[in-house]
């Protein structure tokens, strides 16, 4: 009996402090089949084809982010007060070919495996085969890492002595700082302009590298503000057509917030 009570306890806790709106959004997320979403990989490929070789690596990555945030599909689902999705809806999972360029077989495994399945369509497989793999197969970080390792290292890896070491993904860590609560990205851009003004190209051998990094930061902040503005504009368009007074008011609030955040 005691064991049974412990098993049921999370359900009791779940019922407290959860509004109907949050419960509905949570159920929508939990009940949606995760799926691969190819848009990011395609937009990133476009950006690299356009900019690679014309700018520094930091600037290339920043321009890619700006291209992606300017072009990616965005949506706001009813009841959401915090907006933003990785894909076009709940549980749509983008791929990151710059880190790891999956083979078609990899994607078939994702679609067919029993645990943590990601649905993959025939169109996804076609785009991966014809568009993504030809460009990214030998450009990905994972390919570069594995190509640099000794045969002994590869043998140990294949034997499972060690496995995932983030060669297929970014760490995803966030620097512990409260600056984002005090300053917007437009403020950070002012900091960058001052830093660029202070660069000493005559005496500092690192000045050019610093300029490239600062320039990339400036572009990345533009990208983030572009995305925020797009969500604000979408919320305002949706509010103009909404008949539910509460949701209409929420959309206007979202639009007002996105007009100043993250800028």
What are the functions of these language-model segments?
Residues 2-200:
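Long, non-catalytic protein-protein interaction scaffolds
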Residues 177-263:
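Structured, charged N-terminal subsegments at the starts of enzyme catalytic cores
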């Amino acid at each position: 009996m005691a064991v049974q009570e412990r098993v049921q306890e999370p359900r009791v806790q779940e019922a407290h402090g959860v509004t109907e709106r949050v419960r509905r959004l949570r159920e929508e997320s939990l009940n949606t089949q995760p799926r691969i979403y190819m848009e990011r990989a395609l937009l990133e490929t476009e950006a690299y084809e356009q900019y690679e070789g014309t700018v520094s690596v930091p600037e290339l990555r920043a321009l890619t982010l700006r291209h992606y945030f300017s072009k990616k599909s965005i949506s706001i689902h009813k009841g959401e007060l915090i907006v933003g999705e990785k894909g076009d809806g709940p549980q749509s999972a983008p791929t990151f070919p710059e880190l790891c360029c999956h083979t078609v077989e990899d994607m078939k495994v994702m679609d067919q495996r029993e645990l943590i399945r990601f649905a993959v369509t025939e169109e996804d497989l076609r785009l991966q085969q014809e568009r993504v793999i030809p460009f990214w197969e030998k450009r990905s970080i994972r390919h570069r890492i594995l190509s640099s390792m000794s045969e002994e290292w590869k043998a140990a890896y294949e034997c499972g002595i060690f496995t995932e070491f983030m060669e297929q993904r970014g760490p995803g860590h966030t620097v512990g700082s409260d600056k984002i609560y005090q300053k917007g990205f437009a403020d950070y851009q002012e900091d960058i302009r001052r830093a660029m003004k202070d660069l000493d190209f005559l005496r500092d051998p690192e000045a050019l590298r610093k300029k490239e990094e600062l320039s990339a930061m400036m572009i990345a902040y533009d990208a983030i503000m572009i995305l925020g503005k797009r969500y604000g504009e979408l919320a305002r368009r949706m509010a103009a057509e909404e008949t539910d007074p509460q949701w209409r008011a929420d959309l206007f609030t979202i639009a007002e917030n996105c007009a100043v955040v993250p800028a």
